[in-house]
Design a protein with these regions (language model features):
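Conserved short histidine dyad/triad with adjacent acidic residue
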Residues: 33, 48-63, 97, 101
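Short histidine-centered beta-strand/loop micro-motifs
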Residues: 37-39, 58-63, 105-108
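Short acidic-glycine-tyrosine-enriched beta hairpin
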Residues: 82-99
């Protein structure tokens, strides 16, 4: 193996068009929908595949340490940001910077299933804020995960 290769992915790949969801990530926020982490992923870069039926959503949130790239694979989800709402098209890609400016929600207001991929750098530890829920999560690559209530500004 060449010396400049730091990480070699071993094991099966994943087909983003496959309808077999296998093990799913639990949604604690109430938005519903399906999520699964993608294999392969590296020590720094990761991705998650999401699927939303009508009425499901990925709750409004932003990451303090990492930026994200969303690519719509199927359907026409509604994107909510600090600038308002708009419908995304299949194949459209949207970047969300780290911090409050990157706050976003993805929602399915249509009768068609929505599928999208979110990729980003894995920052550890990471804090994610959910302004509508007045909560924040803390997480690390070592298995730490907690949900914390965020108090109103005085």
């Amino acid at each position: 193996m060449p010396e400049d290769v730091l990480f070699v992915c071993k094991g099966p790949g994943m087909n983003i068009w496959d309808d077999d969801w296998g093990t799913q990530v639990e949604d604690w926020s109430g938005g519903g929908g399906l999520a699964k982490g993608l294999v392969p992923s590296g020590p720094q870069l990761g991705a998650t595949l999401y699927e939303l039926e009508r009425g499901n959503f990925m709750v409004f949130h932003f990451h303090h340490g990492s930026e994200e790239l969303l690519v719509v694979l199927r359907g026409r989800p509604t994107l909510r940001t600090l600038d308002g709402e708009r419908q995304l098209d299949e194949g459209e890609a949207v970047h969300f910077p780290a911090g409050p400016a990157g706050a976003h929600e993805i929602r399915n207001d249509t009768d068609e299933t929505v599928r999208y991929l979110v990729a980003g750098i894995r920052v550890s530890p990471e804090i994610v804020e959910y302004p509508d829920l007045k909560k924040a999560t803390g997480q690390s690559k070592h298995g730490l995960f907690f949900i914390h209530d965020v108090e109103e500004d005085a």
